[in-house]
Amino acid sequence: MSLRFHEIAEARHRILNPFMHEQLMLLGEICSLTSTTCQLDLCCGKGEMLCVWSQRYGIQGVGVDISPVFLKAAHARAAELNCSDRVTFVEGNASTYAIEPGAFDIVSCIGATWIGGGLAGTLNKLKPGLRSRDSLLLVGEPYWIDEPSDDTVRATSGGNRAAFASLDGTRERIESAGLELIEMVLADHHGWDRYIASQWHTVSDWLRANPDSADADKLREWIVAGKREHLAHQRRHLGWGVFVARLI
């Protein structure tokens, strides 16, 4: 998986997950955000969550991402929404980022649990940053809608069936990490399509504009494989959601 390919394919995205703006704002309501809320968002992408929540609720936040392309967009978005004085973006590898213990009301990692080697490891990485038992941990994670075939497992999780769990299995993994699942906001087919299918158009336009690029052939292969994965497997068998938890 090439970060550059994602930077190209998601150039027109603000939210780098199968989540719609309305769902993002619903999640903010669920979290009871206020101007005193301080959030750490690992793998923040273009910073849309921090920026729109800061604009609406006045939260303060720190976003960490490895992509300078995404962070440039995050800084621009913060300036657009007049919240640059409340949100900070740090370029770095979220998997090795040193989280300040007990410093945050919300700690989040939305759709990037690879930073902890999977869901369990990511939850354990995030927990020390929580300020209190009332603080919230947000994690975005896929789940199996039904029992996947071997072909689906190969196409969507690199052949590792245990990479994801069922929806209830996801609850069990969260609880096994010493957390209580208290809410969730799930993606739907429309959200999946807007996230995935819109990348096809963006990449097609990029390939037309850059036919002689050294990346063209591999990017074309990557996006074609992604189409097959989404249409044959992911859209039907793989769900995605943001799960809201707190310490037991």
List each language-model region with its residue ranges.
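A short SAM/SAH-binding and catalytic strip from SAM-dependent methyltransferases
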Residues: 105-119
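Class I SAM-dependent methyltransferase SAM/SAH-binding core
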Residues: 40, 48-96
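A short glycine-rich, Lys/Arg-flanked "PGG" loop and its adjoining helix->strand segment in the class I
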Residues: 120-136
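Short alpha-helix
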Residues: 163-178
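Short, glycine-/aromatic-enriched active-site segment of Class I SAM-dependent methyltransferases
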Residues: 142-161
